[in-house]
């Protein structure tokens, strides 16, 4: 069940300078168009002429037959590439789907494909069933069930101890069919032969959790994985990159084989092979930082051997920085996210040819797009507002969102905006050969064929909404969460009394008002009654506020009060932060208002904290632990006794998901439903 909170979207943080963005987005495709023509034969660019030709009788000679299937629009001059930051398109000249490869490549790849045929039959079946030739009756039935939200479910349990987790597999069919066999290693997923050796070396065997999610990943089902950690991040990255590469090679080989069949077909036979989309890009990686983009590229290049990587130095100069700017005392998840280049506005196209990986290709000439949600939204909205260009997303067949929990700390509206613009019918032809476009693209079913993989450290109501709205795959979907039976609270050893207080909140729509009323009428008066300690005059009360809008509301309410307070938000400049921390530590200010996003972006180590009030339950349970640690260190420094220290958590019944991660699933029901509204833990 999805719990929906009406929390206003946050404002984006960490935007790069315009000059850097311009440098990172300028495409090199225009300069290398001639080289591309030598390596790849593009499909026809006159879409409507080709469509008409496909219905006519083939009575011309072999030259005429080939003309129907080759690019016709060479007379059209390429557009000049200009950076998005300057308000113009970064896409360059549209060149169609682009998965057709030149005759020079046909001979080599066809021989390899023939050798692989016997070994890849099972994989071909999965690809054939989902993408190439789905059964029309079965597809119609499943689409109808999805439209009426009819899913058959099966619960999955795997792992033990810290790796234990639970999954819910849903299929829009009569019943959930178990996978035909266990997927224990890369041997069991029947990769394209050219990926096997590297996959065995770099990925190898799957652990228990990976064995649970691998059938969904390689079976083209949607996956919401809510148990991403620093420890399993690299493995998840390698597995998803392996799947993405495998899909690109599957698509390319299918087109090559069909090209050969078309070339060999008699002139009096009107053969038709629907094996493409409207545009070329097939894979979209939604990433949080430029450094995350570097890690994805590293994974791709270690799984597939490319003879050349064009523009690699330029890419590293713009996207990569040394990953040693934070000391070891910072939390591991913070260092993983923000080490290196933490800019979060970027987008870059990647083109894969027979021997080469080309960075900075134009979107319409790319196989893969790496982007942040902010960067992609600005690419769509650049230029004339009435002529937004999102056609390059029309044929995306796989979306991989790597750190959804971090995206929540940016502006989640960007993620919603991007998903709303994926797989829409294109406004222009872009050189598409409609006779090669798959039927389900033409029928508008691409959103239900697309595979979406979302990786997150935890699941929130907003992520659940994304799952319910945009992850509606005809092959099914799997939601996997970590085990929260005991919750974080059982692992804490501070010995501090923690009081959870539930306030009445009739509706999630009015929850912010009910929360503020409770805080103003109950929490603030109780703070005024707190005794001052003899050694340090300040009360040392830190008020942790997850939402910035709530923070502004509380801060404004204190302006005319008798409280001496300081505040730190994500927008507070460094000088004011130092002043606020200093005055709070020495007791000049009794209250410190501290936002969740300020903690996310900086992980300040705040001294002088003797008591904590959580205005709301943090979505990230690590924040709860770290803020309690402020009090623990005050106790160690003998600034307050363990008996005097306290923690108070204000919550409503709409925060069940956040509570579960802290108090545990075995207790959360009692907290949100019991008649009593005060619950103490030590």
Curated annotation (Swiss-Prot):
Its main location: nucleus. Residues 1-136 are annotated as: Disordered. Pfam families: Utp25_C (PF06862), UTP25_NTPase-like (PF22916). One of its GO terms (biological process) is maturation of SSU-rRNA from tricistronic rRNA transcript (SSU-rRNA, 5.8S rRNA, LSU-rRNA). GO terms for molecular function: rRNA binding; U3 snoRNA binding. The keyword Amino-acid biosynthesis does not apply. It comes from the Eukaryota. Keywords: Nucleus, Ribonucleoprotein, Ribosome biogenesis, rRNA processing. It is found in: Nucleus, Nucleolus. Residues 43-59 have a biased composition (Polar residues). Residues 24-41, 104-119 have a biased composition (Acidic residues). Residues 120-133 have a biased composition (Basic and acidic residues). InterPro entries: P-loop_NTPase (IPR027417), UTP25 (IPR010678), UTP25_C (IPR053939), UTP25_NTPase-like (IPR053940). GO terms for cellular component: nucleolus; small-subunit processome. The keyword Nucleus applies. Belongs to the UTP25 family. DEAD-box RNA helicase-like protein required for pre-18S rRNA processing, specifically at sites A0, A1, and A2. Component of the ribosomal small subunit (SSU) processome composed of at least 40 protein subunits and snoRNA U3. This is U3 small nucleolar RNA-associated protein 25. It comes from Pyrenophora teres f. teres (strain 0-1). The gene is utp25.
């Amino acid at each position: 069940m999805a719990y929906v909170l009406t929390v206003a979207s946050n404002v984006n943080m960490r935007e790069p300078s315009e000059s850097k963005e311009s440098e990172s987005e300028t495409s090199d495709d225009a300069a290398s168009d001639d080289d591309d023509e030598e390596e790849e034969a593009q499909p026809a660019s006159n879409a409507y002429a080709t469509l008409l030709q496909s219905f006519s009788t083939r009575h011309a000679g072999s030259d005429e037959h080939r003309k129907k299937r080759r690019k016709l629009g060479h007379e059209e001059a390429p557009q000049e590439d200009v950076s998005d930051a300057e308000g113009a398109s970064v896409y360059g000249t549209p060149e169609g789907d682009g998965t057709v490869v030149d005759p020079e490549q046909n001979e080599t790849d066809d021989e390899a494909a023939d050798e692989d045929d016997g070994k890849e039959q099972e994989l071909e079946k999965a690809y054939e069933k989902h993408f190439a030739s789905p059964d029309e009756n079965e597809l119609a039935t499943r689409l109808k069930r999805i439209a009426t939200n009819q899913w058959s479910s099966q619960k999955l349990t795997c792992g033990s101890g810290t790796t234990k987790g639970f999954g819910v597999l849903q299929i829009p069919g009569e019943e959930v069919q178990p996978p035909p066999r266990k997927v224990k290693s890369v041997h069991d997923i029947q990769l394209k032969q050219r990926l096997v050796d590297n996959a065995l070396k770099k990925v190898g065997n799957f652990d228990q959790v990976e064995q649970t999610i691998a059938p969904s990943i390689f079976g083209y089902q949607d996956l919401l994985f809510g148990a991403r950690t620093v420890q399993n991040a690299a493995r998840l990255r390698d597995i998803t990159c392996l799947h993405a590469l495998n899909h690109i090679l599957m698509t390319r080989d299918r087109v090559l084989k069909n090209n050969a069949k078309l070339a060999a077909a008699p002139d009096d036979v009107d053969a038709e092979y629907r094996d493409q989309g409207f545009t070329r890009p097939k894979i979209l990686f939604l990433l949080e930082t430029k450094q995350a983009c570097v890690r994805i590229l590293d994974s791709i290049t270690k799984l597939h051997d490319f003879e050349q990587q064009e523009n690699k130095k330029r890419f590293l100069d713009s996207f990569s920085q040394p990953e040693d700017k934070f000391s070891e005392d910072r939390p591991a998840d913070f260092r993983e996210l923000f080490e290196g280049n933490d800019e979060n506005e970027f987008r870059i196209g990647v083109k894969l040819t027979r021997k080469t990986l080309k960075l900075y290709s134009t979107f319409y000439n790319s196989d893969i797009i790496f982007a942040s949600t902010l960067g992609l939204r600005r690419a769509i909205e650049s230029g004339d507002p009435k002529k937004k260009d999102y056609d390059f997303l029309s044929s995306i067949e796989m979306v991989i969102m790597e750190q959804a929990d971090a995206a929540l700390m940016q502006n989640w509206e960007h993620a919603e905006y991007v998903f709303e613009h994926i797989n829409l019918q294109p406004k222009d032809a872009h050189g598409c050969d409609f006779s090669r476009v798959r039927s389900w693209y033409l029928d508008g079913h691409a959103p239900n064929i697309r595979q979406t993989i979302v990786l997150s450290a935890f699941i929130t109501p907003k992520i659940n909404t994304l799952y319910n709205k945009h992850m509606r795959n005809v092959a099914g979907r799997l939601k996997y969460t970590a085990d929260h039976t005991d919750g974080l609270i059982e692992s804490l050893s501070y010995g501090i009394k923690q009081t959870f207080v539930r306030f009445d909140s009739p509706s999630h729509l009015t929850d912010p008002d009910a929360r503020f009323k409770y805080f103003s009428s109950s929490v603030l008066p109780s703070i005024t009654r707190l005794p001052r300690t003899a050694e340090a005059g300040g009360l040392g009360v830190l008020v942790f506020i997850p939402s910035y809008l709530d923070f502004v509301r509380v801060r404004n309410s204190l302006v005319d009060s008798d409280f001496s307070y300081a505040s730190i938000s994500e927008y507070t400049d460094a000088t004011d932060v130092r002043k606020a921390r200093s005055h709070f530590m020495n007791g000049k200010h009794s209250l410190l208002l501290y936002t969740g996003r300020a903690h996310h972006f900086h992980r300040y180590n705040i001294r002088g904290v003797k008591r904590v009030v959580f205005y709301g339950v943090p979505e990230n349970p690590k924040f709860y632990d770290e803020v309690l640690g402020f009090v623990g260190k005050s106790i160690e420094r003998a600034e307050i006794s363990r008996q005097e220290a306290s923690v108070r958590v204000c919550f409503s019944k709409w925060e069940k998901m956040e509570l579960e991660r802290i108090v545990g699933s075995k207790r959360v029901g009692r907290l949100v439903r019991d008649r009593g509204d005060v619950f103490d833990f030590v």
